[in-house]
């Protein structure tokens, strides 16, 4: 009787250990799904990124490079302003009559420009803002493409459109990103296994 009890206790312990192992495996798998590893292409310019992904909302400026360039540009602009101010001060002392004539001409030009833009100022401001934004983006020397799964260089937009580049103008190796995959503008196309796309089967009519 004692042997039978010991045998049954061992079986129960083995079953509990197996249940614990199975539950740990499930937790590990779920953790792997939530902490997906994706990658992003690195580009030297906005034009290169657009050549691959076709949509400007899929290209993002590298924040590290952008902050560094802004600091350098601000310093250069400060030096340039000091030089121009000194030059203007010297010319004002030398040629006061010429400066007055130039000032009158610039005022007339400003008035004519204001009259021309007064018909639709909002449109002019929108166009100017868009052009300035695009030119500022082109001045940045490092851009990142959207996040995608290794081995499947494709993303989906919020409207459901799948974008898969046919070219690759990125430089170096893609940047690996861990954690929450995707952004507001795109999501990586599923590799299969965790979520499968809906498939429609068409029946052939006889």
Curated annotation (Swiss-Prot):
Basic and acidic residues biased stretches: 108-118
Membrane spanning residue stretches: none
PROSITE patterns associated with the record: PROKAR_LIPOPROTEIN (PS51257)
Protein name from the UniProt record: Uncharacterized protein HI_0930
Compositionally biased region (Polar residues): 66-79, 182-198
Positions with biased composition (Low complexity): 97-107, 155-167
Signal peptide interval: none
Residue numbers spanned by region Disordered: 64-123, 155-206
């Amino acid at each position: 009787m004692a042997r039978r009890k010991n045998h049954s206790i061992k079986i129960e312990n083995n079953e509990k250990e197996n249940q614990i192992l199975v539950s740990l495996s499930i937790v590990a798998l779920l953790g792997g799904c939530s902490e997906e590893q994706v990658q992003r292409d690195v580009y030297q310019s906005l034009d290169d990124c657009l050549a691959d992904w076709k949509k400007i909302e899929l290209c993002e400026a590298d924040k590290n490079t952008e902050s560094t360039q802004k600091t350098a540009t601000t310093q250069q602009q400060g030096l340039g302003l000091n030089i121009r101010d000194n030059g203007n001060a010297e010319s004002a002392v030398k040629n006061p009559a010429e400066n007055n004539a130039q000032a009158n001409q610039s005022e007339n030009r400003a008035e004519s420009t204001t009259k021309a833009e007064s018909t639709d100022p909002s449109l002019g401001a929108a166009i100017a803002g868009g052009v300035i934004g695009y030119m500022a983006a082109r001045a940045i020397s490092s851009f990142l493409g959207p996040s995608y799964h290794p081995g499947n260089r494709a993303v989906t937009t919020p409207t459901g459109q799948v974008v898969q580049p046919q070219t690759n103008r990125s430089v170096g190796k893609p940047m690996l990103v861990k954690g929450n995959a995707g952004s507001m503008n795109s999501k990586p196309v599923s590799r299969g296994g965790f979520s499968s796309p809906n498939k429609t089967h068409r029946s052939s009519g006889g």
